[in-house]
Amino acid sequence: MPNIVLFSGSSHHDLSQRVADRLGLELGKVVTKKFSNQETSVEIGESVRGEDVYIIQSGCGEINDNLMELLIMINACKIASSSRVTAVIPCFPYARQDKKDKKGAVERWSRAPISAKLVANMLSVAGADHIITMDLHASQIQGFFDIPVDNLYAEPAVLQWIKENILEWKNCIIVSPDAGGAKRVTSIADRLNVEFALIHKERKKANEVDRMVLVGDVKDRVAILVDDMADTCGTICHAADKLVSAGATKVYAILTHGIFSGPAISRINNAAFEAVVVTNTIPQEEKMKHCPKIQFIDISMILAEAIRRTHNGESVSYLFSHVPL
């Protein structure tokens, strides 16, 4: 069996180091830089001939630069005769652009790009043999690839966090901030043996504000909002206010991917949250300095175990329902 080599891109070195430590590995030598014209340069600093290569690069920060860096790293390892190249992408870039969506007038549908499919094509053409990611925004993105894709889930780690950190978890209710997340929250609610609710955004006519309609009873319960990602946090912060006004005793938000761009931090600080809990698929250190409500769940053990099992030819489905030690 070939040896395993683990490389880190520039997007999230802390997570890469955590994964390497759990695997008992040193991160491979790689130098990334930019030329004066802003082209990305990558130099792999060690032999990868015949090796099983894993490159960790999350879709965050300077997303376009980091995506290009990942593509170049994949290609550099592939043409250096590695036996297999796996791209480990904790937060998949462009995942929200997964279909032709209505963005105004109906006639604009035909001109909307499906950028997630384009990213899938680029990764394959660059030379990736396998993709490991987490909580894809749309699970059908797996079908955009002609190579194996392992979509891991943060759910087991989320369940563990709830049981360890919310004393009243048996009296909680799991809430989806929109109808699209109903399947996610029902799965968590079933495993906790609690009820679920959802918030439906009722679209108004032009020049009228959308109205949020709560479906479910949260009175005198701890409400836990669950979603796969939050960007500017307008939806979840309005949802938190709605839950408090409906009688929830406390409100938490648990998200896999905390993007937190634009006014997100100020909105969270001013919202009625006890805590906003995210995984570390995206770096959160700087944001936590400005927002004490943000906490994170470390998912490096899930990624590390997925890499170990993939390298050894073992099934990764165990990770869909268990948190590795």
UniProtKB/Swiss-Prot annotation:
ATP binds at residues 96-101, 137. Activated by magnesium and inorganic phosphate. Competitively or non-competitively inhibited by ADP, 2,3-bisphosphoglyceride or GDP. Mg(2+) binds at residues 135, 137, 146, 150. One of its GO terms (molecular function) is ATP binding. GO terms for cellular component: cytosol. Pfam families: Pribosyl_synth (PF14572), Pribosyltran_N (PF13793). It catalyses: D-ribose 5-phosphate + ATP = 5-phospho-alpha-D-ribose 1-diphosphate + AMP + H(+). GO terms for biological process: 5-phosphoribose 1-diphosphate biosynthetic process; nucleotide biosynthetic process; pentose-phosphate shunt; ribonucleoside monophosphate biosynthetic process. The keyword Iron does not apply. Pathway: Metabolic intermediate biosynthesis; 5-phospho-alpha-D-ribose 1-diphosphate biosynthesis; 5-phospho-alpha-D-ribose 1-diphosphate from D-ribose 5-phosphate (route I): step 1/1. This is Ribose-phosphate pyrophosphokinase 2. It comes from the Eukaryota. Belongs to the ribose-phosphate pyrophosphokinase family. Its cofactor is Mg(2+). The gene is PRPS2. It comes from Gallus gallus (Chicken). PANTHER family: RIBOSE-PHOSPHATE DIPHOSPHOKINASE FAMILY MEMBER, RIBOSE-PHOSPHATE PYROPHOSPHOKINASE 2.
